[in-house]
Amino acid sequence: QYLCREGEIIKDPSLDIPNFRKSRYLPRILSEIETEKLITAPDLSSAIGIRDRTMLEVLYASGLRTSELLNLRYSEVNLQQAVVKVFGKGAKERIVPLGMEATAWLKKYYEESRQELLKNISSDLVFVSSRGRQMTRQNFWHIVKKYARLVGIDAAISPHTIRHCFATHLLNHNADLRVVQSLLGHSSISTTQIYTHVATTRLKNIHSCHHPRG
């Protein structure tokens, strides 16, 4: 392409290479049953277990990016209306519903666990580490991997997988693509459309496995 622009050659030879353009990556998606197993894996007898369960509930209910979840502050959470105010890429603000289940877990975490984790440290962050500090992306990645292994999910799972599940499961239940785009904070609908391909692929797999002539 550079040589073409500079006038050194007439035609870009890379155009003759089959499938030169990289195909779009289809993300790994957990089934709804697998997602439920992952979310309910934490041991609720400890403050850390309640925190982890709450983080997984909020992540699946809202589809937040990992950075958005870890930077979430209580001043941005409205438990009465069950919504969070999120500042995403480019500092774009959006309002995301939490649903009843995630809201209930946030209340439980706040009332029963958060103060124990804070250890007298003052912080407006919703989720903190076992030392009362801000949790790192790597910390949360290890948490998700730990629970995935615990419930027998061997695939390459990360916190972002749960965001993928959020979008795909909504579309599987006939959510409008534009609404999903808004919830995810995508600036372009083409970014969101990848999930329609994932949903279609899953439907084809189900058909092929269960239909007598599949």
Model-assigned labels for residue ranges:
Residues 1-214:
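Conserved catalytic core of the tyrosine transesterase superfamily
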